[in-house]
Structure formats: structure tokens, C-alpha cells
Amino acid sequence: MKDEIIQQTGAYIASSILKQPNRVIKTDQALISSGLIDSFSLVDLALFVEDTFNVHLDDSELNKDIFDNLDQLAELVVSRAA
């Protein structure tokens, strides 16, 4: 499940947020702290994750400590789905 979350979320970031559908987002690549994703894009990403994986994310979780790379994000989703 974790690999599927990483794949789908990475593809969403590349195509819908960055508008670079062929770009590959590495699992440990910093998203927020590197400036790759801004606060507006972060909200879009959170809505995608909630809708796609049927989990609830608290606004307080939308930060670089929890949401800064695909691996962290997938771990959060897996923990919520359990």
C-alpha cells in the first residue's frame, strides 16, 4: 500500500502541482523545506490525499515535519488507514 501511495502522490505532484508530468519525485526529496511546494500547493496536495486515500488530515499536520517528503506522507496515510 505504501508504494502505491508514493507512486500516486508523486504523480499528482508532478502533473497537477508542478505541471511537469514526466518529472520523478524521489521518496526522500524535500517538498516543503526545499520550496518545491508552496502553502497553496500543500492544501491542494492535502485535499488530493484525503480524497484519494479516504483519510482525514488535520490542518496542524500540514507542515514540513510531517509532510515534507513522499515517504513521510505515505507513512501518515498508512497509519490512518490501519
Features from the language model and the residues they span:
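Thiotemplate assembly-line natural product biosynthesis machinery
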Residues: 1-23, 75-82
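Phosphopantetheine carrier-protein modules
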Residues: 17-36, 53-63
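Catalytic nucleophile serine of serine hydrolases
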Residues: 39
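Conserved catalytic core of two-component sensor histidine kinases
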Residues: 43
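AMP-binding/adenylate-forming catalytic domain of the ANL superfamily
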Residues: 61-72
